[in-house]
């Protein structure tokens, strides 16, 4: 990365501000940066961006990827500790903004213009911007081209394909079905929703749609696929990834972060839209991965300089992308460079079919309530209707 990216005046101002913050309870020492990101993202590439920043500016940058990063961030930031920068999808942002764990940002015009406006909107909450968008994420159907010539358009086609492949000792599909993020597309296909909207168009947490007739159709499909042996009981992400890598399963539902391992395994794979449910398109959550500045940080201006003038530049994004694919970059110029890649195109297609994850604090109740519901559905402890009704009641505090 070019050292010219650092502007001496801005950097001097950053250090002045960092010293000013030193008296307050902070995450790290002034003039140093600690960055947290999830373990399935390109943390080694992000560290390279940090190393380039250190070389250019003399500011040490450490990148970590703790387990249960959101939980640890909440605890640490509430205690005046933790990272200076936290990179995470936008859906938890409203909760952290409301709790005072992150600070609003005011990006310059060029920074804002370089990034898709829809990505910025994901980080808007109560009239302010709370994070810098890095990439737009949407899961899709990843298929092994050696086993699937044409990806199925519907789940009816998936079930037919499973019969054909079962005769050869293979299975058609597997995904981390107890994880709401991966199963939501089939619940949303028929009209399932997390929250309704109020008269102003804002999310209304008193209007819950996880037990709507459309969501129930998707849940019944999931229960049936396990009951009828199309997918095994008790499978998770590791089982899915292992079976796909061994060629035992022809398709999986996952995101761009999975591509790198598939390339290393020399699997010729493609990405397609998630199959339809009962004639309705599956609608994945669209997440915008972004970087937020923690309220306790003593180095807020240094953090801003690092994000705006290093990480979000095409050179910085390329470092992260080379480690683990970003999927669809929010940066317009970098997306243009990658747009010829059919897997990037398919990811954008899935994003266009999907819906942004709500970013209000009540999303925490959604994730916990739906996790229990899916476990109960797939283990046969509750019928799909009982499980979804219970999830809706928990979300409403009943």
Where are these regions (language model features)?
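Conserved N-terminal structural module of periplasmic/extracytoplasmic solute-binding proteins
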Residues: 14, 27-95, 109-112, 256, ...
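Extracytoplasmic/periplasmic substrate-recognition and gating elements
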Residues: 51-56, 129, 220, 224, ...
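Short helix-initiation/N-cap motifs at beta->coil->alpha
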Residues: 65-73, 91, 157, 232-246
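A structural signal for short loop-to-beta-strand junctions that line the ligand-binding cleft
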Residues: 83-84, 112-145, 171-172, 281-283, ...
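Hinge/lid segment of periplasmic solute-binding proteins
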Residues: 90-138, 150-162, 186, 270-272, ...
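Extracytoplasmic/periplasmic solute-binding protein
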Residues: 130-134, 139, 159-207, 249
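Glycine-centered hinge/linker elements that transmit conformational signals in sensory
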Residues: 162, 204-234
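Long, aromatic- and glycine/proline-rich binding clefts that accommodate carbohydrate-like moieties
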Residues: 272, 320-369, 376
């Amino acid at each position: 990365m070019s050292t010219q990216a650092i502007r001496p005046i801005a950097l001097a101002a950053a250090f002045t501000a960092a010293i000013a913050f030193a008296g307050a309870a902070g995450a790290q020492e002034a003039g140093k940066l600690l960055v947290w990101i999830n373990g399935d993202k390109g943390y080694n590439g992000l560290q390279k961006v940090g190393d380039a920043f250190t070389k250019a500016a003399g500011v040490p940058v450490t990148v970590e990827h703790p387990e249960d990063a959101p939980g640890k961030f909440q605890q640490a930031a509430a205690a005046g500790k933790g990272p200076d920068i936290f990179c995470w999808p936008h859906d938890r942002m409203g909760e952290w903004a409301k709790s005072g764990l992150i600070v609003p940002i005011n990006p310059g015009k060029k920074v804002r213009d370089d990034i898709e406006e829809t990505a910025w909107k994901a980080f808007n909450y109560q009239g302010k911007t709370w994070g810098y968008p890095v990439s737009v994420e949407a899961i899709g159907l990843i298929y092994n081209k050696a086993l699937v010539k044409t990806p199925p358009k519907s789940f009816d086609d998936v079930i037919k394909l499973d019969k054909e492949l079962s005769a050869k000792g293979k299975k058609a599909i597997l995904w981390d079905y107890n994880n709401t993020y991966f199963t939501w597309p089939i619940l949303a296909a028929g009209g399932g929703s997390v929250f309704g909207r109020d008269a102003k168009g804002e999310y209304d947490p008193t209007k819950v749609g996880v037990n709507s007739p459309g969501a129930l159709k998707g849940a019944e499909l999931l229960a049936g696929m396990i009951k009828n042996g199309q997918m095994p009981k008790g499978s998770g992400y590791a089982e899915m990834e292992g079976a796909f890598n061994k060629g035992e399963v022809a398709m999986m539902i996952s995101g761009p972060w999975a591509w790198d391992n598939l390339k290393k395994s020399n699997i010729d794979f493609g990405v397609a839209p998630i199959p339809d449910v009962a004639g309705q398109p599956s609608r994945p959550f669209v997440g915008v991965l972004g970087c937020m500045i923690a309220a306790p940080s003593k180095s807020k201006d240094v953090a801003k300089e690092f994000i705006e003038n290093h990480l979000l530049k095409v050179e910085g994004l390329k470092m992260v992308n080379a480690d683990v694919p970003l999927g669809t970059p929010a940066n317009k110029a970098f997306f243009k460079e990658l747009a010829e890649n059919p897997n990037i195109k398919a990811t954008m297609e899935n994003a266009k079919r999907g819906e942004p994850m709500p970013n209000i604090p009540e999303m925490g109740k959604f994730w916990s309530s739906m996790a229990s519901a899916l476990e109960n559905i797939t283990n046969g402890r509750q019928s799909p209707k009982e499980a979804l009704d219970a999830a809706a009641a928990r979300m409403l505090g009943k």
